[in-house]
UniProtKB/Swiss-Prot annotation:
Role of this protein: Neuropeptide PDF is the main transmitter regulating circadian locomotor rhythms.
Span of the signal peptide: 1-20
GO biological process terms on file: neuropeptide signaling pathway; response to light stimulus
UniProt propeptide residues: 21-58
Modified residues (Alanine amide): A78
Protein name: Pigment-dispersing hormone peptides
């Protein structure tokens, strides 16, 4: 029984740390500020560039359409 309690405590600590990492990213990007506010300064741009790369991988519209339709890139280029 003591082992189950120890495992539950360890899992709780690990989950708590994972959630705090997301909060750090959110505070780093200042995403909790009101909408409509752009990158007003170089400091905000630097914070955006230092953030985790998962926020910085935009896809073009053609890449999104091809991924949804399952078309290979060569087939899309041949149609141009």
């Amino acid at each position: 029984m003591a082992n189950y309690i120890t495992i539950a405590i360890i899992v709780g600590i690990v989950c708590g740390q994972a959630l705090s990492v997301e909060d750090v990213d959110r505070n780093l990007l200042e995403l909790n500020l009101p909408y409509g506010r752009g990158l007003d300064s170089e400091l905000q741009l630097a914070r955006l560039m230092l953030a985790a790369p998962r926020f910085c991988h935009p896809k073009r519209n053609s890449e999104l359409i091809n991924s949804l339709l399952g078309l290979p890139k060569n087939m899309h280029n041949a149609g141009k």
